[in-house]
Amino acid sequence: MKHTPLFNVALTGLLSAIALTACGGSDEAPVAAPVVAVAAAVFPPVPTLIAHRGASALRPEHTLAAYTQAIDDGADIIEPDLVATKDGFLVARHENAIAILNADGSIRESTTDIATRPEIASLLTTKVIDGTSIRGWLTEDMTLAQLKTMRAVERIPAIRPGNVPFNGEFQVPTLQEVIDLAKSKAIEKGRTIGVYPETKHPTYFKSIGLPLERRLIDVLAANGWNSKEAPVFIQSFEVGNLKEMRGMTTARIVQLLSSAGRPFDFVAAGPSETRSYADLVTPAGLREVATYANGIGPSKDMVIPVVSGALGTPTALVANAKAANLITHIYTLRPENAFLPTNLKRAPATDNTLRGESVTEIQTFLQAGVDGFFTDESAVGRAAIRTFVKK
């Protein structure tokens, strides 16, 4: 498997507006535009800098502003998590629950201002998502037109107070809008910009009649991106839907991995399926992953665990993945104290909002041989790559 192919990318212009009518239950169609050639280049470059939900340390996550900032700061690829609306559009949100309430009715977490919009607030509901009961507002209960009336807000304001002034400024983008932005910025920058979509809760969405897989592949195909040469990586924490999409596309696929727990489709399969993520990262498990995927996306602690507050000795995962012909893209390298090992925090370590020694953390993982990484601040990631010296 060659994960850095050489190819010319034909890029179309940015759409100025979106259609609000779903066609065949998929995302809106791109508009034809003059073709602009970008010089042949190896894509993606290694190490690969992947903007986790955009520049989410600097702008509210999963907004065009966050993706734009990330590209301007040097990201090779932007990542939209994908959920479906009632009328079948794919939109970029970390969860289908765009606001979650506590038992007392207060907001536990929110990525939109829906709670302040009485005309839509009546859609409040309680559902079980992947075995967890959630009370809040969910994308599958509203149309794209309804979702477009809302505005994004910062998900973790206590850690990212600098993003709060941007609350209420940006819409929730569709997958098509994210692709349009990537193509437009590629023309502007003269380099390929990739997209790294994640299907969120695919078993759940299939159970309610809104399967994500065909919708995603149809949008990629409509953009000329349903091929192994396309600047696309498709990812999921589940297994079955990645295998299903392998039958629909030759685009690159990445199996996401967690240091604990099980893929939810394994859980949903019942007692006949007993495997966990731990089984997928054995040498035999990785060889099976390689039958449908081009790479793995493990949590960073699966590559280098934290021991006594500091990064410890790398595990064998990267080497074992390479032996199975799989690339490794780790998640998530974030700049704030809240997410760093104790020895890399900036004093006072108790202030979770402060930026710590994130460059050092990133370079430690590069030294361990990862092929790429997800980061919340692309400028920091680019600085780490630029100054990295392999030992």
Map each language-model feature to its residues.
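Bacterial Sec-type N-terminal signal peptides, specifically the leucine/valine-rich hydrophobic h-region
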Residues: A17-L20
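Bacterial N-terminal signal peptides that target proteins for export
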Residues: K2-A10
